[in-house]
Amino acid sequence: MNINPFANVSLQDYLEIVQIVDSTFPIGSFNHSFGMENYLREDTVTDDKGYEEWQEAYLASQFKYGEGLVIKLVYDAMATDNLEQVWHYDKVLTVSTQARETRQGTKMIAKQMLRLIQRLHAIPVLDDYQSKIRKGEVFGNPAIVFALYVFNKGLGCSEAIALYGYSVISTMVQNAVRAIPLGQFAGQEIVLRSFSQLEKMTQEIQELDASYLGANTPGLELAQMKHETQVFRLFMS
């Protein structure tokens, strides 16, 4: 990464980006475990070690080839002002998600993120995205919302992937803290240890093309599907 990756971003813009990636930004992510709760139900994840193994697998597959990669692809498309390609990636990533609740949860988070960002900042390209979602022409994905937002702010692609990844990790760990449960300190240790994986993945994503978009690990998808019929649960997905 650059020595100063935020050199072209004003302090005001940087703080506005930080606000969006903060785990307290109310977009509903805390309602979703994306299959982790099924691993709890089946006693596959029972403690901090088990959770960390699950998170590493999630980041290395569903995040890397999904939300992480789509941020890179959106940046590539926006460099040539190709919004039609962005809308195409929205459709590919959505239809590649096998679990119904995960698809629905992702769309709900995207809509809420769009609603909040537009109330705060009113960015034209996000107006276009919001309009297409309302018309049913695209589905909505929070990583695409974020990518369009930070591209508009002048943030670099690698930094965008890393910051979005941090937001995902932070939220998932907080969900694990209350669901497993984990201690707050154990949770923060997991967040810290995840940074090396996130940095490595950010670099690897730069070498991927659109043919990888939506690839996933069957075990994660099956857990997300089984969660849909789980009787007792804390999370919507």
From Swiss-Prot:
Protein name: Urease accessory protein UreF
Cellular component aspect of the GO annotation: cytoplasm
Major localisation: cytoplasm
Keyword 4Fe-4S on entry: no
Complexes and interactors: UreD, UreF and UreG form a complex that acts as a GTP-hydrolysis-dependent molecular chaperone, activating the urease apoprotein by helping to assemble the nickel containing metallocenter of UreC. The UreE protein probably delivers the nickel.
InterPro entries the record matches: UreF, UreF_sf
Cleaved signal peptide residues: none
Protein family according to the UniProt entry: Belongs to the UreF family.
Highest rank taxon of the organism: Bacteria
Matching Pfam families: UreF (PF01730)
Compartment list: Cytoplasm
One example GO MF annotation: nickel cation binding
Organism the protein comes from: Streptococcus salivarius (strain 57.I)
Statement: the UniProt record of this protein carries the keyword Transmembrane: no
Phylogenetic classification of the source organism: Bacteria, Bacillati, Bacillota, Bacilli, Lactobacillales
UniProt keywords, alphabetically: Chaperone, Cytoplasm, Nickel insertion
Stated role: Required for maturation of urease via the functional incorporation of the urease nickel metallocenter.
PANTHER family: UREASE ACCESSORY PROTEIN F
